[in-house]
Amino acid sequence: MSQPLIAFFALEAIVQLIAMSFLQIGMEKERDELHQKLAAQTDELTGAANRRSILQRADTLLASCRDRHVAAAVLLLDLDHFKSINDSFGHDIGDNVLKATAVTLSGVLRKGDLFGRVGGEEFACCLPNTSPPEAAAVAERIRNAISKLCLMYSGVAIRVTVSVGIASTERAGYDFQELMKAADAALYEAKARGRDRVEDETAQPRHAVFRERLAS
């Protein structure tokens, strides 16, 4: 092989190496940007959507339901006696309870449903194309599945229960913040009625404090 031809192939190889290096740098940058985007949308502990993410995604989903004139619902969940679990068994066990709850929600919810951790021991779900009876059925499946969770700590079985509040677009409109308020009032009514239960926004408050919360 002649010297000019050898030099040509050597130059071509160098050019290819440079091109591959730029491609790799570009792919790494794209991967880093994707990782940062996902991290900004994800609750670090549970892997579920964080509050900011579910607020944004739920608004989009509810707008689509409104435009198509179909019902939707929002569920607000709060783990019962979670502070007692943390105080009695430690925050590591509390973290495990939150993780197990997220896994349970992921397994129970339907394709197209959204859920995320919105703070502390609270999770929110947005259910598109869902009537009030269907929302109640989903909420009850969630409550039942979580009631079957059992974590062990030093030979002690830790049982977990959850209270769930439901708000439907048929009664509360399509604004996510308003739906969350209605679901929050229903959730506190579930707490007032003994916990480990599901209530919707039609529940009549049993105590003045809950009546005031619903009216505010």
For each feature predicted by the language model, list its residue ranges.
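Membrane-embedded alpha-helical segments, specifically the hydrophobic cores
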Residues: M1-R31
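Conserved nucleotide-binding and Mg2+-coordinating catalytic segments in signaling enzymes
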Residues: K37-Q56, L77-H91, K99
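Short regulatory alpha-helical coupling segments
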Residues: L38, R51-A71, A102-R110, P128
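Residue-level recognition of strand-loop junctions within catalytic nucleotide-signaling folds
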Residues: D87, L127-T130, S147, T169-E170
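Short helix/loop segment flanking the catalytic signature motif in cyclic-nucleotide metabolism enzymes
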Residues: V97, R110, A124-R141
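A short pre-motif secondary-structure segment
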Residues: L114-R117
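Catalytic-core segments of nucleotide cyclases and related cyclic-nucleotide turnover enzymes
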Residues: A136, S154, T169-S216
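Catalytic core regions of nucleotide second-messenger enzymes
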Residues: I146-V162
